[in-house]
Amino acid sequence: SLKKFSFTKNEKFIQEVLWRVYWKGWLELRPTVWKDYLFDLEKIRKDYINNQNYKNAINGSTNLKCFDEWVKELKENNYLHNHARMWFASVWIFTLKLPWQLGAEFFLQHLFDGDAASNTLGWRWVAGVQTKGKNYIAKEWNIKLFSDNRFQNIKLNEDAQTIFDSRTYSIETKNFENIQDIENKNLIIFDNNLSFETSDFKDNKFNKIFLVLNKNENRKIKLNQKNIEFKENLFEDQKKRLLEKSIDCKIIDINDLETMKENLLCLYPSVGENLDFINSKKLKNISFLYRKIDQYSWKYCNKGFF
């Protein structure tokens, strides 16, 4: 990108990429945060299954026009601008008074760019449990200003206290070093690394590349159909590009990994549903390969975001 455009034009894009790297690194060093989130979510789902306020929120029928429009946009486009995501989360938590865990799930179900780390930790930050005692409060004037006065009479809770969570998380010691002998082995790739030809390992020779699709049957958070189809199309596109380069590849279901007994290499999927599957099935024949940017950056992700 820097070869085509000036740093000034690239700066915001680079910042957003590095924010994702930071969030992923922070969660890698504290993976129990993700585990606790899924545990809490399972209980909260049961508690709110018949909650009308929750149903109104996910159906975009809260009578808070800006929020209802964001729900519609999210469902139709599977995307929200970063600023709108912050407003959405703040309204969900502090005005609608719904658990942040359900909101984070709603985002992951619909966002094409949904990511376990940036999504979970972003919602935690808005709630005030990521940086203890500091929450993000959406303000009426701010929404009006940056939506070109599209919305009026926005009644928000602008004096909300942070959500309290007494749990703390210590940094875990992790090894992100790559093994030396990676030639002439089979490689598996998940949906977070579907650009093999631009990866750090594009020049290595692999026997075969398996593109691993994780469908809803193995997910704790079920993706909506548009999101599933989006991922399937990404896999098909990556397969097409690999075949054009005469690289032997195949799309497989994540369950097929259990029947593959040979030693496998894997572009590291990061903390989330794909890694959860590998760990839950105790697939010891898989060795991870880490990106250089992650190897360099994650060791510095030891502080919170203020």
Predicted features along the sequence, with ranges:
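Trp/Phe/Arg-rich N-terminal binding region typifying the photolyase-homology
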Residues: 1-15, 19, 25, 29-42, ...
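Structured secondary-structure scaffolds
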Residues: 1-116, 125-131, 136-138, 142-194, ...
